[in-house]
């Protein structure tokens, strides 16, 4: 409701991925057991099994982050970096079954710890151990596939065109 009241047409906060949510909760629980607090949000368990397709929730269009069909493995910058080109080649046939893609990347996906002189304590985050060169090779492969297989639009461009089902 808050988004609709502020005039937003869409949201992209839904991440329907059991593997991601279970891993996230495992990390957060481990931190709690060690006396540390995470700033991450636990999230609603029902999110894991929500629709992978765009749909209306109240008066706002929800455009979920892409997960692979069937296995619901998350396809975001972090996991693509960890997969590398070999892993992406394995996932590619599943991705081609998806009729909607919402690929999420963050600025941190383009960091190279050595080149950028980032604090070595961040090596605890596995995707930061991967060179920028390797990440760019994987991201380029993915984005070339996307450009060839889908009509590329921003969510802002797509939202007003969507005519799918409305949830009450």
What are the roles of these predicted feature ranges?
Residues 10, 77, 81-168:
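C-terminal domain-boundary segment and adjacent tail
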């Amino acid at each position: 409701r808050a988004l609709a009241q502020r005039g937003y047409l869409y949201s992209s906060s839904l991440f329907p991925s059991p593997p991601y949510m279970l891993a996230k909760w495992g990390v957060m629980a481990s931190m709690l057991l060690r006396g540390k607090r995470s700033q991450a949000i636990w999230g609603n368990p029902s999110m894991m099994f929500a629709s992978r397709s765009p749909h209306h929730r109240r008066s706002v269009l929800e455009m979920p982050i892409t997960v692979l069909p069937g296995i619901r493995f998350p396809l975001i910058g972090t996991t693509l970096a960890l997969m590398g080109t070999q892993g992406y080649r394995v996932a590619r046939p599943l991705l081609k079954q998806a009729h909607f893609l919402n690929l999420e990347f963050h600025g941190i996906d383009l960091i190279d710890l050595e080149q950028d002189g980032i604090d070595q304590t961040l090596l605890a985050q596995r995707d930061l151990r991967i060179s920028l060169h390797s990440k760019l090779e994987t991201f380029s492969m993915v984005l070339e596939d996307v450009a060839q297989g889908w009509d590329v639009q921003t969510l802002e461009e797509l939202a007003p065109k969507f005519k799918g089902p409305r949830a009450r």
